[in-house]
Amino acid sequence: MNNWQHSFNNARPLDEHLHKPYLQYDGIEKHLTKFIFDDHANLVWTGDTYGCVSSYDVNFQPYVRQRAHIGGSPVKDLMSHSSGVLSLSSDSLHLQDRRGTTLLNLTNIDIAAFNDLQTMCYMSADQTSKVYCAGTDIGTGLSLIDLQRGTLETNIPYFSKVNFIKSSKKLAAIGKLSGSIDLFDPGSNQVIKSFISHSSCITSMDIQDYTLVTTGQSNGFYNTFADPFVNVYDLRTMRQLPPISFSKSTSMGTVGADFVQLHPVLPTIVMIASSSGAFDFVDMANPSLRTQFANPGNGIKCIRLSSNGDHLGVLESNDMFSTWKRPNSSVNFTNMPELLTYPSYPNDGPLANISIDDYNYPLSTVGMPYYQEKLLSTWSTVIFRSPGTVPRDIDKILTDLKNSKKSKKLVADGVNFYPYSVAKYGHKDALQPYISLRDKRYQRSTGSVPDDVLITKSVDGELPPAFKNLPLVVTKYATDSFDFESVNKTPYCGLDNDVDNPFTNALIQLYRFIPEISNFLISTLKHEHFESPLLTDMAYLFDMMRNTIDGICRTTNYQMSLNDVLEKNNLSLHTISESNMLQKINSLSLNDDGGKKQLSIQELNDFLLSELCEEEVKFIDQNFVLQHCYCCEFAVKTKGCMTYGQTSGSLYKPSITIGPNACTQKNGKVSYPHSILGYIEHGLKNSIVLNKKCEQCGIKENLEEDISIQELPPILSLSLEFDDNAMKLAKTTKNWLPKEFYASIMKNKPLVRGSVNDIRTNTMIYKYELHGYIARISDPDRGDHYVTFSRIYNEESKMFRWYLFNDYLVTEVDESIVYDLGKHWLKPEVVIYGDAEELRKPFNYLKDVEIDDSILYKDYFSAAIRESIQKEYELLTRNEAPRPGSLIAIDAEFVTLKNEKYDIDCRGAKTVVQSKVSALARISVVRGNEEQFGVPFIDDYIIIEKNIDDYLTKFSGILPGDLDPKTSNKHLVPRNVAYRKIWLLMQLGCTFIGHGLQNDFKHINISVPKEQIRDTAVYFLQGKRYLSLRYLAYVLLDINVQEGNHDSIEDAYTALVLYKKYLELKSNGMMDQVLNKLYEEGRTTNYKVPLKL
């Protein structure tokens, strides 16, 4: 290996694209990270810190460049492939062909194990369709990727930080960050041998056939240093050979070895190099035969041999690239290079003679001449440096706008002049912070959250993290893998925002802490009533939230009932953010709202309270608890025509709308109230002039309606509809939102004052305290959304505390933050004041209260199909009434109403804007007692009259028509009937047995206490891999289940028998042994049940 010569005329920088003017202020390091020779074409591939992959031909002219990894992720590793090149970043794997077209792109959104990746290799030298990926995250292990399918084939547990991984035909060598090496068998996925190679770390490694070589570093007194030798291992005998020294007795002295590579053609020759620039070619059969060289210029960052062994590429520390080659060697990098494709130049033929005075001939048809020379615009920055072009002058119209003092003249000249609103948009000179897309993708895929997410105090007027619009919790394992405890350290549960209308969560959190409303709704659950779905579903939700501590609840059933009520009234909910991608998608959908009135949150507040009052009357005749709780009673007098005088009546308003009509005008100036009290007083008295027909004589004329207050409720709900001027005054006025005020009625006129001494009357005086309010938050990153401030009374400390509810984020906030309305990103829209004594009442629970459970012992039929149903269950009797600790097994099936919707930007980043919407389709419950063990007593199919995108028949066993009352022969019941049965069983203290109960309870929308759950998927869990019910039944019970479509009765019974098996193994002390055997044998079949021949 003598006579290597350095090519001085071809050294050139390969980082020119990283030094563009528009990249100089982003704060990212700009250098190349890796280079390789292509094994199938005359190309050199490089990767950089921006995630770009570039290729250069034999003349080192740019051929292809592509942004392979987004989010500023540097390229960690490159590998030549028959179809192109593979590149690896810390969280993604990319495959592209040689023309720059993406063939495969996998990120940590697709594969959660992609985190802190460092290296990759093929499964074996002969099998290049599968790739191992590994890194420094010990929790992710080794990921085996199938490139043909583009999926994760398997994830192998490996609890060490990996720095390098190389493979040969039989084995793979794993270089650990600790300095040791593991030999890995791809056939059995086991480590068969380990070596301690270097005391600190491994810096380079290569493997070929049965030879493995490594370089590394050792620990010194104060730092590490490169070892001056190369370790050699014989993989046939599984032992270490004598090491080979590097640069022994040279004029350069003894330097450490940083790079090593076996010669691709000569198996006994190894190339060893140092970062200082020295490199040797050594014959391992006779280490004394060596040739020493020194690379001129800066130090070496990366050094590689081409696949034919004729070229040696050197990437220096300043990103200059040069090559070494032997005399009379081939110019090709590989023995049989593929032909590179270039754009073809069409021959347009000779141009016709055109007169220079012919103005009718378009110049664009002449075209550009074809050239082979290099243009000045593409010269290297090393040769030709330019400070850039001079910026254009500012348009005269813009300078006039800047210097003009009168906007009226601009409007008269046809120029629209809009002053910038600092209160609405914030400071215009504020620089937008850099947002790491890599961090965002990692947080979404792993369920992690930033450390500062609970910060509520604003810094420099900016939006604090706790107020920001939270992303959808959609990870690989849905919401189960998300760390909700990190965003909620309070005893009050949050709400999942993975629903159709997430901003309705704010209303739920506002009213659930009003004792009178919450206690009444929950008390209605004692009775059986299925005709008021909105009221009962809201009651079930309040009960579930009250029993769930520091967790999360879903509002699925409540949202479905609310949508049904809105649909009946031809209404829909307004999307508050114009930039919301989901709104844009829905506007293009065939199922658009079609002219429905869209309700704002103020209108929804009034509509919801009114609907609850109406359903309360239907639920319990002559019951007006809610009406007396929050409805204001008004007397309405209508002054008719001159003939018939006036008429009178009563009006109950659940919410008082206050807005800019409370302002007064004097001397042409508009005056607004200096606190919310003036708006409240104006809202409680009103006089309206309507132009309509008189009901007595039918004459159309102006009729005056005088509305006067008669009685104030304990709870005062206020809907704020302010214009910009009124809101601006509220933000700049101190104590605009008072902590408390006093109100009274004198001569049918309201008196609202800040102090009790300001009211002089003999009538009753009410003291109101601020309970909470809903605020609209302007988030520049993710659009507007709503949060709730609630003041909650603690019975132990006898004190009130303020809490912020932002969907699933719940945190305690300081009182000063609540009353500070001066922030430009906050706008209150619904405010609740409550009677001082009312807010201190205790919350009641349903414990030790007699509940109507008759639905458990009778059939409930829908659509008169009693005679034609197929009954597969046997009803409970009073003799076998459930008691605390009664064993029951449950399984539920679901169908898909709507599939997922994504927002894919121009870079290919995919964001979930609407998760998959599922609906409960069937619930089966079987007995677990010894008398009638395994006999079902509930088998309810749920009526679904909405469009169903996918019945999931293979997994649910539901066929088209099974859920339709017109065609089904199943036992169909409404959703609230089936839900009440499960809720009653939970209230009676039954113990639920099932497989994957967390998913079942999530779709049923019920929160069962942990002490009442026996989940066989958790009992037979080792690590993170859950075993399927079918596999466990096959191995442990020796039965085949789910051979065709799933059947919920069969699945529930199998889970029950499996739980009995678990108790038997636990009592015998065989559980750990059987569990280890389950996973060891399951790896050979990928935990699948063998197919029948």
UniProtKB/Swiss-Prot annotation:
Coiled coil: none annotated. Residues 336-462 are annotated as: Linker. It catalyses: Exonucleolytic cleavage of poly(A) to 5'-AMP. The keyword Hydrolase applies. Keywords: Cytoplasm, Exonuclease, Hydrolase, Metal-binding, mRNA processing, Nuclease, Repeat, WD repeat. Its EC number is 3.1.13.4. Positively regulated by the regulatory subunit PAN3. One of its GO terms (molecular function) is nucleic acid binding. InterPro entries: Exonuclease_RNaseT/DNA_pol3, PAN2, PAN2-PAN3_catalytic_subunit, PAN2_N, PAN2_UCH_dom, Papain-like_cys_pep_sf, RNaseH-like_sf, RNaseH_sf. It is found in: Cytoplasm. Residues 888-1058 form the Exonuclease domain. GO terms for cellular component: P-body; PAN complex. Contains a pseudo-UCH domain. This ubiquitin C-terminal hydrolase (UCH)-like or ubiquitin specific protease (USP)-like domain is predicted to be catalytically inactive because it lacks the active site catalytic triad characteristic of thiol proteases, with residues at the equivalent structural positions that are incompatible with catalysis, and it cannot bind ubiquitin. It functions as a structural scaffold for intra- and intermolecular interactions in the complex. Belongs to the peptidase C19 family. PAN2 subfamily. PANTHER family: DEADENYLATION COMPLEX CATALYTIC SUBUNIT PAN2, PAN2-PAN3 DEADENYLATION COMPLEX CATALYTIC SUBUNIT PAN2. Catalytic subunit of the poly(A)-nuclease (PAN) deadenylation complex, one of two cytoplasmic mRNA deadenylases involved in mRNA turnover. PAN specifically shortens poly(A) tails of RNA and the activity is stimulated by poly(A)-binding protein PAB1. PAN deadenylation is followed by rapid degradation of the shortened mRNA tails by the CCR4-NOT complex. Deadenylated mRNAs are then degraded by two alternative mechanisms, namely exosome-mediated 3'-5' exonucleolytic degradation, or deadenylation-dependent mRNA decaping and subsequent 5'-3' exonucleolytic degradation by XRN1. This is PAN2-PAN3 deadenylation complex catalytic subunit PAN2. It comes from Candida glabrata (strain ATCC 2001 / BCRC 20586 / JCM 3761 / NBRC 0622 / NRRL Y-65 / CBS 138).
